[in-house]
């Protein structure tokens, strides 16, 4: 029996059409699989690479723009004059150093004003060595790395002050026990404090055009050193002058509070607090001058 040629031709055409459709479907499926694999590959990443590059470029441009800006005196940055933003890749070390200084100074000053009628002040030895001393040395190194010469010199110096003060009362160093006469020991302590009074006065001269809190910190600290030095130089019966010790302790408490105030100015921001610490800028500072004079001096500092 002969086959119908028209039916066979139609059957062959239908077969070719089905194979063509299968080929198209297979090609379409392969593209879907490739797209899914590509999405799966990039799914492990937070964002495409070109978005990361654009975001990084914007951050670099913003940091470069901040480097060009000049900021006024600030105790929060431990900067007594106009300065550029330096701590770009890490945080501001000034609040850490200021807090270490404030804590140790406040504790010793409480003993000096006879708070709680504590007779022996050796409790301050450990904080003086590890918080007031070591912490301020670390803050000094970070300030130096960020380009803040003032902060590095001051934090490093007072860190060494607390380390040396603690070593005086540590028996292993045998400093206090080496004096047979208590009056000689007290007089030596007085000379030691006079040296720190001179250094603090030099630092004070660098803050006369900054802020009120910044200037008050070193002004009260300088008076504290002077009164304590006079107390140890004017000894009676082997003991320092009690009245001068207590008055010096009061100035030390005020200095510690001023240091905490400046530290809080660097910690409290609009992102983490409901308030920010105000800056009381002296009218004779750069920020207190007129806009034209301030811009002129900023341009001069920028040229330097």
From Swiss-Prot:
One of its GO terms (biological process) is meiotic cell cycle. Its main location: endoplasmic reticulum. The chain crosses the membrane at residues 93-113, 123-143, 150-170, 188-208, 212-232, 247-267. Pfam families: Gpr1_Fun34_YaaH. Residues 1-23 are annotated as: Disordered. InterPro entries: AceTr, Gpr1/Fun34/SatP-like, GPR1_FUN34_YAAH. It is a multi-pass membrane protein. Residues 1-12 have a biased composition (Low complexity). Keywords: Endoplasmic reticulum, Golgi apparatus, Meiosis, Membrane, Transmembrane, Transmembrane helix, Vacuole. Belongs to the acetate uptake transporter (AceTr) (TC 2.A.96) family. NCBIfam families: AceTr_1. This is Meiotically up-regulated gene 86 protein. It comes from Schizosaccharomyces pombe (strain 972 / ATCC 24843).
């Amino acid at each position: 029996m002969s086959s119908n040629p028209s039916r066979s031709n139609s059957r062959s055409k239908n077969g070719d059409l089905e194979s063509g459709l299968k080929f198209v479907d297979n090609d379409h499926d392969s593209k879907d699989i490739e797209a899914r694999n590509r999405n799966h590959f990039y799914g492990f990443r937070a964002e495409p690479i070109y978005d990361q590059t654009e975001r990084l470029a914007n951050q670099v441009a913003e940091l470069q723009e901040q480097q060009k800006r000049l900021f006024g005196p600030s105790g929060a940055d431990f900067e007594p004059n106009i300065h550029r933003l330096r701590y770009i890749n890490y945080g501001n070390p000034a609040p850490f150093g200021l807090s270490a200084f404030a804590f140790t100074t406040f504790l010793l000053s409480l003993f000096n004003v006879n708070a709680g009628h504590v007779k022996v002040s050796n409790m301050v030895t450990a904080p003086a060595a590890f918080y007031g001393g070591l912490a301020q040395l670390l803050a000094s190194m970070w300030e130096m790395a960020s380009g803040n010469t003032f902060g590095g010199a001051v934090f490093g110096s007072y860190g060494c002050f607390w380390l040396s003060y603690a070593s005086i009362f540590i028996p292993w160093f045998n400093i206090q026990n080496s004096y047979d006469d208590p009056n000689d020991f007290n007089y030596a302590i007085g000379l030691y404090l006079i040296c720190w009074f001179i250094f603090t006065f030099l630092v004070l001269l660098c803050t006369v055009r900054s802020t009120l809190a910044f200037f008050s910190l070193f002004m009260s600290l300088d008076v504290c050193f002077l009164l304590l030095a006079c107390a140890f130089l004017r000894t009676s019966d082997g003991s320092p002058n009690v009245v001068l010790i207590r008055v010096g302790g009061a100035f030390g408490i005020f200095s510690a509070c001023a240091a905490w105030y400046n530290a809080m100015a660097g910690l409290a921001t609009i992102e983490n607090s409901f308030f920010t610490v105000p800056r009381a800028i002296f009218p004779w500072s750069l920020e207190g001058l007129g806009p034209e004079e301030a811009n002129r001096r900023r341009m001069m500092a920028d040229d330097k």
